[in-house]
UniProtKB/Swiss-Prot annotation:
Lineage: superkingdom: Bacteria
Gene Ontology cellular component list: cytosol
Biological classification of the source: Bacteria, Pseudomonadati, Pseudomonadota, Gammaproteobacteria, Cellvibrionales
Reactions performed catalytically: dihydroxyacetone phosphate = methylglyoxal + phosphate
Domain MGS-like: residue ranges: 6-154
EC code: 4.2.3.3
Signal peptide coordinates: none
Name of protein: Methylglyoxal synthase
Organism: Cellvibrio japonicus (strain Ueda107) (Pseudomonas fluorescens subsp. cellulosa)
Length: 154
């Protein structure tokens, strides 16, 4: 796979996702970092987004609920370059019927080289980083080169 440089902007598009047993934890994290989050474009899966928006007043673009395809919707947005960071508080103790979607979402985040926080401390580290509100260079798959190579049969 060939890679190319692709900047993450100073004002990032942040996807917020939480399993049912972690929604209150994510809400508490959003409250703690309210001022920092206001400067970014926020999106969330349906129920999580509605809760955060109602309880914090943050503007949240609400996607479909996770079990109905919201995790895959976030993944699609990552591949389109429309998500710069993922904060995903998942419950390691509770199996979910859409666990394959969760695994796919984490894989896509790794493929497209976006930062992922899976708990309060890792999310705190992201907000505390100077990279949270400054442009950052990263390498992503060069899809055009990939398609050109595939079209040639390689």
């Amino acid at each position: 796979m060939e890679y190319k440089q692709s900047p993450l902007p100073a004002n990032k598009a942040i996807a917020l996702v939480a399993h049912d047993n972690k929604k209150q934890d994510l809400l508490a994290w959003c409250r703690k970092h309210l001022d920092a989050l206001r400067h970014h474009q926020l999106m969330a899966t349906g129920t999580t987004g509605a809760l955060i928006e109602r309880e914090t007043g943050l503007a949240i673009h609400k996607l479909i609920s996770g079990p109905l395809g919201g995790d895959q919707q976030v993944g699609a947005l990552i591949t389109e370059g429309k998500v710069d960071m993922l904060v995903f508080f998942w419950d390691p103790f509770e199996p979910m019927p859409h666990d394959p979607d969760v695994k796919a979402l984490l894989r896509i985040a790794a493929v497209w080289n976006i930062p992922v926080a899976c708990n309060q401390v890792s999310a705190d580290f992201m907000v505390a980083s100077p990279c949270f509100s400054t442009p950052v260079e990263r390498l992503i798959p060069d899809y055009a080169a990939y398609m050109a190579r595939r079209a040639q049969g390689n």
